[in-house]
């Protein structure tokens, strides 16, 4: 064994101790070790073992054995069984990798740049075998989650993993016997106010997940009764190029809105699987710009093509304030915002708009004239369409409440 490996072996207990201390310092869930010395000792033992196996196997680039991988998986099981969260699991893996690389760097620096061949050997070994170890650890972790968590909570964890780019998503999907698609539509259903009664929509979400077989998670809004249902709906690759939402998304949104019984708004954004974290932010912004709809199956998911003007306006306060002033000027009239909404939703077809409002076409005409009187803007003009349709959507989205 060369001098780099000898130095790593000499420093293994010290470096393992430093790793345990880093867990205590940087990961809050590990602070319970202060009262659980056995757990701390077991982690110390594992950290020393992993460093020694690195030193034993890397000189001739030998792989971790099946027994090694089973031991690593068992550590993942122990930590999951102790209640470690997925976020902490990810922190542990990142911190461990960073510290192992620091161990190697410090050992090489202590030799003043010598033993380059040994440094290349250990680094060549570390990347592929580190990946195998991480996979084994994740699989052990998921084994316990599958045993401990109810089905809907497993699905919610899969949704969160997909939306944060956590590699554990593949293991969770396999445990649920689901195949991860190449493309998805991230859908955010915004619910400003949950139904009365104090329940947390568990039944509605469980029904939705089992019916549509999609990962979904409820995210409550702090300090309110509202929140978001976020679903990851598989779609075909061509859906990314279409301006409308996939049919599967529309079906899911309609089912949830009907079961919810409260006004809600939905936004959706499509993306390849590895770009879901960014598409979540887009879908969330779209849902905040979309109008709140009545709780029926007719609630539809909005896309960027539907509300791109409103998205832009929301980022320009001076324009948003002007539109808000136009909206306030409509307040003296009879149901003018609702009337304009129907008028534009029916492509300015007077007969269809009047029928949807259950009024006579002449009543519709009167209301449109009243809009022009109050705002100085003709609803049927190009300027009126551009301005008043945006006013209506902003008002119905709840942006100005």
Describe each region flagged by the PLM.
Residues 50, 92, 126, 201, ...:
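Hydrophobic alpha-helical membrane-association signature
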Residues 40, 159, 170-173, 202, ...:
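Short amphipathic alpha-helical segments
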Residues 129, 157, 161, 200, ...:
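Amphipathic alpha-helical interaction/coupling elements
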Residues 1-156, 334, 338-401:
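Alpha-helical/coil-rich non-catalytic "connector" segments in signaling and regulatory proteins
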Residues 139-190, 339, 360:
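Signal-transducing coiled-coil/dimerization helices and immediately adjacent hinge/linker segments
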Residues 172, 178-179, 183-184, 194-198, ...:
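Cytosolic nucleotide-utilizing catalytic cores of signal-transduction proteins
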Residues 116-124, 204, 245-252:
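Glycine-rich, flexible loop segments associated with nucleotide phosphate handling
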